[in-house]
Amino acid sequence: MPSLRTRREEAEMELSAPGPSPWTPAAQAHVSDAPAVTHPGSAACGTPCCSDTELEAICPHYQQPDCDTRTEDKEFLHKEDIHEDLESQAEISENYAGDVLQVPELGDLCDDVSERDWGVPEGRRLPQSLSQEGDFTPAAMGLLRGPLGEKDLDCNGFDSRFSLSPNLMACQEIPTEERPHPYDMGGQSFQHSVDLTGHEGVPTAESPLICNECGKTFQGNPDLIQCQIVHTGEASFMCDDCGKTFSQNSVLKNHHRSHMSEKAYQCSECGKAFRGHSDFSRHQSHHSSERPYMCNECGKAFSQNSSLKKHQKSHMSEKPYECNECGKAFRRSSNLIQHQRIHSGEKPYVCSECGKAFRRSSNLIKHHRTHTGEKPFECGECGKAFSQSAHLRKHQRVHTGEKPYECNDCGKPFSRVSNLIKHHRVHTGEKPYKCSDCGKAFSQSSSLIQHRRIHTGEKPHVCNICGKAFSYSSVLRKHQIIHTGEKPYRCSVCGKAFSHSSALIQHQGVHTGDKPYACHECGKTFGRSSNLILHQRVHTGEKPYECTECGKTFSQSSTLIQHQRIHNGLKPHECNQCGKAFNRSSNLIHHQKVHTGEKPYTCVECGKGFSQSSHLIQHQIIHTGERPYKCSECGKAFSQRSVLIQHQRIHTGVKPYDCAACGKAFSQRSKLIKHQLIHTRE
């Protein structure tokens, strides 16, 4: 069975084909013999009724010179033209029997063929004249033809032409006496100004089509009309589900997907599903490393052009969207909407697992991964997976060494902006996080959380080797190295090995002499920030750590721990040479130098060596004459803090050293030792 061909192809074949015309006398005789039932009131031209007449009977009707249905600018020279005009969008097969074309009865076409088969868009209905037996005019056929691309549609009994079927429908539904008078445009009339504009704007090479509302130019008449529909508010395509109207059929089809629960497009990377293919394609670009769209201002690259356009607004000073509550302005309306939820407290996105609510849907999606354990973002270098793409990007800087965030004060670079913000507080001295129990302030929230464990006594981190518990995970990790004996960090200058990188960094300051942390009170410098913090308590007198046994307070937690061993008698650090035990690891280290004879600390003034750095520091005061420790009672100054403490007992009368033999008390331990000799001689 031959397929339907376009009008141009048929015409070219007829003009070029040799032999007699297919419009033969036999065909004309057959047409003239066909029964012709006329429309009521149309006896003058004998318009045949579509329900009782085959196509051949309409051929002479189309060629009546005075027929109302014959348009001024459309003539049908061949029966193929009539056939195509009537059925251009219907899938109807043609059977050639000699020179006569057989088609289904047109009444069947009127009544039985579905609106969708005729190309009528979803949400529109055929006019009354097409849904029952009645006028099946060329104009009605134009209505069926229009939505699928034909350019010119004719209105029955009204010499007008339209480019969109909705405008033709509107024309047909107006009574003849109410139709407007023809504009002076060759006798053609239009119901809407947009139709007149569409009629006037036949494009030529010299004059493109211009929209009178916005000045936009078009090369095609349908594009101009679609633009003008936006301005006039005319919406021709209606959704059957919600009644919403649209100016374009393609937009209606996209809208229909919002009523569908099924999401047909699923991402193979992360499993997220989408209703529309365009949304699915945009999402997939997030997984791709390709970022072809680059900002000319800052060089930042994006996977989507829309993301680039949004980013470029960040370089613009204009922020047209302002919050009515606080006056903060935003470049995007979506950002303003999200911001306003801070004031309203609205959190519309609720987790179905735990009930936690979020202001943004993106935060809910990220949170869901804590329940599912999903980590869709994997590092190509080491294979480590992350639940968020932002975490992956931060991690990748470990491999690249990139540190894009630089401190304006000292020039120190950082891989994360959060680390830069924390570092800035070193320069500003800002400590925004305050303990509600003791009032102590911290520069980082994590430091406050760790500090609060002093008050609560919480030690959530337990060593699985010895069962010892710690308040901080970092301290547990350091402790576990005691069991392994591992010291992977070695000094390149002296070869000394350390179990922690921080200890190595601090040690290297011995060789470089670098002491970047200075005390604002006395100017003393330190190689470690922690030592500076401890030193500053000398000036403030702060002693936040209190012994629960005797009430004694200490400036350092480590000193408190060491002190508590006096009460419990615990001496966990034992010398493997002589078996002597100590309550402090530092005392054991100092003691072991007795066996080795090691004195690594040498005075640069006199060359004297010492086994402990503290002894060297105390010795150097002899050369400098410095006496930094002053008694608050009498003003007397001392070179050593321990001597000051002993001196203060003169004023307080404290005698902490008791003789076990006679009970006599002494203010100094050395005096107790001398006294005990009296009993041993006896």
Swiss-Prot record:
Cross-referenced SUPFAM superfamilies: beta-beta-alpha zinc fingers
Gene3D superfamilies assigned: Classic Zinc Finger (3.30.160.60)
Region (Required for nuclear localization): 268-393, 341-373, 473-503
UniProt keywords, alphabetically: Acetylation, Activator, Cell cycle, Cell division, DNA-binding, Isopeptide bond, Metal-binding, Mitogen, Nucleus, Repeat, Transcription, Transcription regulation, Ubl conjugation, Zinc, Zinc-finger
Endpoints of the signal sequence: none
C2H2-type zinc finger segments: 209-231, 237-259, 265-287, 293-315, 321-343, 349-371, 377-399, 405-427, 433-455, 461-483, 489-511, 517-539, 545-567, 573-595, 601-623, 629-651, 657-679
GO molecular function: DNA-binding transcription activator activity, RNA polymerase II-specific; RNA polymerase II cis-regulatory region sequence-specific DNA binding; zinc ion binding
Superkingdom as given in the UniProt entry: Eukaryota
Biased composition (Basic and acidic residues): 1-10, 113-125
A Gene Ontology cellular-component term: nucleus
Cellular localisation: Nucleus
Region named Disordered: 1-33, 112-134
PTM annotation (N6-acetyllysine): residues: K487
GO term, biological process aspect, one: positive regulation of megakaryocyte differentiation
Region span, Necessary for transcription activation: 62-210
Function recorded in the entry: Acts as a transcriptional activator. Promotes cell proliferation by facilitating the cell cycle phase transition from the S to G2/M phase. Involved in both the hemin- and phorbol myristate acetate (PMA)-induced erythroid and megakaryocytic differentiation, respectively. Also plays a role as an inhibitor of cell apoptosis.
Subunit (UniProt): Interacts with INCA1; the interaction inhibits INCA1 activity and induces the cell cycle process.
Protein family (similarity comment): Belongs to the krueppel C2H2-type zinc-finger protein family.
Name by which UniProt lists this protein: Zinc finger protein 16
Classification lineage: Eukaryota, Metazoa, Chordata, Craniata, Vertebrata
Name of the coding gene: ZNF16
